[in-house]
């Protein structure tokens, strides 16, 4: 399907994601990925901050409010907690968490898993898989819309994690 993959390898697509078990026959599956030049423990806090904002195009899905650019002292996410905040509204729920490894949530009928896959040299693959059961005719549009927003989100999380890791690794 057009728009269903960005930044992922075949092995990223073939791996198992927690959201795979949550939608029996998804009409849309989308995989996104980015290589972050920081270890997983530096990426994880930024992934958990999606609870505070979407980190994509804030002028679109956050009504112009900027997603936080500094780490806030948040407790570890738990199943049942809110998944994200957009436009000042709490949206969705966290379905499962494996701290430092994966965060899975649901919003508007879609389920999504953020997976951190550590690589060599203190780098991390930040992977996102989205699944949804929607009308067949809507799936291509959803995949393209998600591609645009998820790409921006992952690139923002990458930039923030790398910047913060660099500042912590080399203090002023």
Residue ranges and their predicted role:
Residues 1-74, 162-163, 167-172:
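Hydrophobic ligand-binding cavity/cleft-lining segments
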Residues 10-14, 106-159, 168:
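Beta-strand/loop substructures that line and gate deep hydrophobic ligand-binding cavities in soluble
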Residues 27-35, 102, 111, 123-125:
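Intrinsic-disorder/low-complexity, polar/charged segments enriched in Ser/Thr/Lys/Arg/Asp/Glu/Gln
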Residues 32-34, 92-94, 111-119:
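Hydrophobic/aromatic beta-strand elements that line small-molecule binding cavities or substrate pockets
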Residues 41, 52-53, 88, 97-102:
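Short, charged/polar surface micro-motifs in flexible loops or helix N-caps
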Residues 43-46, 94, 126-128, 157:
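Hydrophobic pocket/interface hotspot
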Residues 78-80, 96-105:
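Short, hydrophobic/aromatic-rich segments at coil-to-beta transitions
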Residues 85-91, 109:
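Short coil-to-beta-strand transition motifs
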């Amino acid at each position: 399907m057009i728009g269903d993959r960005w930044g992922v390898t075949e092995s990223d697509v073939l791996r198992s994601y927690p959201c795979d078990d949550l939608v029996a026959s998804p009409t849309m599956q989308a995989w996104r990925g980015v290589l972050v030049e920081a270890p997983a423990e530096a990426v994880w806090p930024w992934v958990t901050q999606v609870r505070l904002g979407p980190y994509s195009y804030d002028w679109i899905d956050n009504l112009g409010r900027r997603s936080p650019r500094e780490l806030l002292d948040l407790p570890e996410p738990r199943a049942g907690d809110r998944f994200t905040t957009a436009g000042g509204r709490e949206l969705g729920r966290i379905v499962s968490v494996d701290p430092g490894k994966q965060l899975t949530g649901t919003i508007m009928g879609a389920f999504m898993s953020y997976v951190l896959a550590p690589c060599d040299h203190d780098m991390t693959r930040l992977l996102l898989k989205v699944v949804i059961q929607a009308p067949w005719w809507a799936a291509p549009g959803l995949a393209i819309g998600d591609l645009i927003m998820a790409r921006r989100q992952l690139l923002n999380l990458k930039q923030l994690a790398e910047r913060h890791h660099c500042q912590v690794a080399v203090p002023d």
